[in-house]
Amino acid sequence: WHIVNHSEPKLRKELDELTKNIYQNNEMGFYIERDWFLKTSLMLIDSDVRFKVKNFTSEEVGKIQQQWSEIKSCIKETFIFIRRFGINPQSLISKNAVIPVVYWLYKKQTSGHPLYTTINLLNKNHNERSVISQWFYMVLLKGIFGSQADALLTSIRDVMKNSLSDIHFPLEKIIDRYKGSNKDLRFDDEYIESLLNIRYGEGRCRALLHLLFPEMNPTEVFHIDHLHPRNHFSKKYLEKLDYIANSP
């Protein structure tokens, strides 16, 4: 970052403005740091995604600057997209999970234009949005970006790069790529059992609901404790019920 900071004041200013714009825009509302934008940019120019000084050569920085207008637009459209399918700042437990989505929307062409230019048009790309959101919920639930994120981003990029002629986001290919590894996206019985332990207020709740009920309105606001008020399960309340039940 310090290379960009000192030698490219214009890009530094652009990054700061993008952070502010995404955070303050009601259609997005996510706080994204500069480092994330730079890592994403390295991903989009098909460079080494590891955040090291040697990866920010003048050539790499030049490519980012040359494509910055398109990169910036794609990033914003991606955050609008994930917000619309129900992800908010609390449920976005891995910002690295957004990077492959940005890559696909940037590289995939539809009718001669990058997919990010039309992904948020409601009369288009319904199936595409459905497949990408399914992958995203799976990734958040499985937490596969918790370690070795750079290696994972690189290998997912390889799968997507070889799938740009596919009709839709290569969900099945990505699942196949990681079968049997510690990044396996499949849900076995043991893992499904563990999902029952997701607690009230946990960021993964939303992702689980969407996988269970794909027809659910992504923008619906749920009041989780309406069925059984949460405060009725506090120790104090339960002791009160026990006292009433056992009173003579």
What are the functions of these language-model segments?
Residues W1:
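Acidic, glycine- and histidine-enriched catalytic cores of nucleic acid- and nucleotide-handling enzymes
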Residues H6, L11-N182:
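A cross-family structural signal marking well-folded subdomains
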Residues T117-L121, F233-D242:
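Short helix/strand-bridging catalytic loops that position acidic/His residues to coordinate divalent metals
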Residues Y137-Y237:
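Intrinsically disordered, low-complexity N-proximal targeting/linker segments that flank membranes
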Residues D242-P248:
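C-terminal soluble interaction/assembly domains
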